[in-house]
Amino acid sequence: LFTQTIVVPYLIPMLENAGAVVFTPRERDWQTNEIIIDNDTPRQGTAYVEANARGEWHPTPSPGFAFHQGSYRDNENPFLAGTARQSKATRSKKRYNLISYQPNFPEEGRYAVYVSYQTVKKSVDDASYTVWHKGEKTTFKVNQQMGGGTWVYLGTFDFDKGSSEYNRVELTSQSAHRGVVTAD
């Protein structure tokens, strides 16, 4: 068996570069600060915003993540304790719904970015996430037909201290396919 000091910096990137989708049972980020933004319980200094230009965001039929202070009990699943949101996917490049997550970073540094969503019957395979980091943007297409109800790693990025529009994550309802985009 490999230790985390080999798996995280070497083995996981090799597998991902080869096209594998890697789920790890342990945290891959070395950052000691953790920021969680959830639609159910916005935390002080963070912002969760839904913008509707085409339809609305609605609750998903299945439960979603809920932030919990303290320790979890045996068999307690935080991804079954809250709600999640969904919107009808659109092909429009100009009119779409958007969710913005804006953290308040306690210090400048490198932070891993994870997203959560629910996999539902008509989930799209190309949900569009954009990570804004120090004013730069990196866009990802995420297959929401798998990996729902857990944390999905997007990458590790440099962020400035504090809360700023230049440091945020956005999810849009844009897709090349008919279906549903979910967010949690």
Model-derived segments and spans:
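Short beta-strand-plus-loop segments that form exposed binding edges in beta-rich domains
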Residues: 169-180
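Surface-exposed coil/turn segments at beta-strand junctions on protein surfaces, enriched
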Residues: 92-96, 106-108, 147, 160-164, ...
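Glycan-processing catalytic domains of CAZymes
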Residues: 1-30, 156, 160-162, 171-173
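Extracellular carbohydrate-recognition regions
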Residues: 26-63
